[in-house]
Amino acid sequence: MKSVGINGYGTIGKRVADAVSAQDDMKIVGVTKRSPDFEARMAVEKGYDLYISAPERENSFEEAGIKVTGTAEELFEKLDIVVDCTPEGIGAKNKEGTYEKMGLKATFQGGEKHDQIGLSFNSFSNYKDVIGKDYARVVSCNTTGLCRTLNPINDLCGIKKVRAVMVRRGADPSQVKKGPINAIVPNPPTVPSHHGPDVQTVMYDLNITTMALLVPTTLMHQHNLMVELESSVSIDDIKDKLNETPRVLLLKAKEGLGSTAEFMEYAKELGRSRNDLFEIGVWEESLNIVDGELYYMQAIHQESDVVPENVDAIRAMLEMEDNPSKSIEKTNKAMGIL
């Protein structure tokens, strides 16, 4: 049973904590928070030992009546690996300032720069390259979504080139200080966007160009993909391949699943905690091949799709499982992923 800690119990951190707790080969030793907010209180209520990453704020936790077990550094000393879920840019500083000095393995989130961490990870793309490594960055929610569907297509028939238009949510549901509220924003206004190069950190030889925009919604990201195929296949071949791929769902608009809002309603009907949809939802009706080019649309629940990949990264880095398919299957079974 490997000992895991979560540095940053927020949107991703709290989900990874629950995912790790569901496994039978790893456990959560503790989680960290900087502020005595409702998430800190609920972490303690759920039974997680809470450590503070800002020791000077200990009094504020005491005043709020939130039990603190110790400091983040004290937590790190007890761990085999830490999952860093701190805000963008903080993880790289933690790597250099704390983890390397302590000799502590760490996974990071997609907000960190690949070059600063040195290695990126996706369960389906480069699991074996991360086995035994000290530091790895789980690629972003958008990149994870692209890899989930492009990998099986590449395995089936090969890919010449990918072009993708990313329609990104403006903010997470709880983020009241972000937007846009009444605009469509090219983000970035330059082409290509960073998503293509991010995919190439795990699918090394893929020819991919992306562009992205922000829209006033909070529920999910949406992708529109155009994929030039190397060999001839039918739509049924593509459907069969995606249907057999873990963490991918073919969903039908004609069954009332024609929007991201309805995808989220589907997650509720699955009985998921926090309404999470770990799987990438592909609109089955969007699949089409024209002159050797595959077209399809998919949606990504940005708060949760990277969570199972964090669990797989732990197994790879701690050399708990060298077969990616076995780790994926084990993670999925424990988390109830389809």
From Swiss-Prot:
Annotated metabolic or biological route of this protein: Carbohydrate degradation; glycolysis; pyruvate from D-glyceraldehyde 3-phosphate: step 1/5
GO MF terms, alphabetically ordered: 4-hydroxy-tetrahydrodipicolinate reductase; glyceraldehyde-3-phosphate dehydrogenase (NAD+) (phosphorylating) activity; glyceraldehyde-3-phosphate dehydrogenase (NADP+) (phosphorylating) activity; NAD binding; NADP binding
Residues engaged in binding NAD(+): 11-12, 111, 169, 302
Binding-site positions, D-glyceraldehyde 3-phosphate: 140-142, 195-196
SUPFAM superfamilies in the record: Glyceraldehyde-3-phosphate dehydrogenase-like, C-terminal domain, NAD(P)-binding Rossmann-fold domains
Main location: cytoplasm
Keyword Nucleus set for record: no
Extent of the signal sequence: none
Catalytic residues as annotated in Swiss-Prot or TrEMBL: 141
Enzyme class: oxidoreductase
Disulphide-bridged cysteine pairs: none
Cross-referenced InterPro entries: DapB_N (IPR000846), GlycerAld/Erythrose_P_DH (IPR020831), GlycerAld_3-P_DH_AS (IPR020830), GlycerAld_3-P_DH_cat (IPR020829), GlycerAld_3-P_DH_NAD(P)-bd (IPR020828), Glyceraldehyde-3-P_DH_2_arc (IPR006436), NAD(P)-bd_dom_sf (IPR036291)
GO CC terms in record: cytoplasm
GO biological process: glycolytic process; lysine biosynthetic process via diaminopimelate
Enzyme Commission numbers on file: 1.2.1.59
Keywords: Cytoplasm, Glycolysis, NAD, NADP, Oxidoreductase
Reaction it catalyzes: D-glyceraldehyde 3-phosphate + phosphate + NADP(+) = (2R)-3-phospho-glyceroyl phosphate + NADPH + H(+); D-glyceraldehyde 3-phosphate + phosphate + NAD(+) = (2R)-3-phospho-glyceroyl phosphate + NADH + H(+)
Localization, UniProt: Cytoplasm
Family: Belongs to the glyceraldehyde-3-phosphate dehydrogenase family.
Subunit (UniProt): Homotetramer.
NCBIfam families reported for this sequence: GAPDH-II_archae, PRK04207.1
Protein name: Glyceraldehyde-3-phosphate dehydrogenase
Record organism: Methanobacterium formicicum
Lineage: Archaea, Methanobacteriati, Methanobacteriota, Methanomada group, Methanobacteria
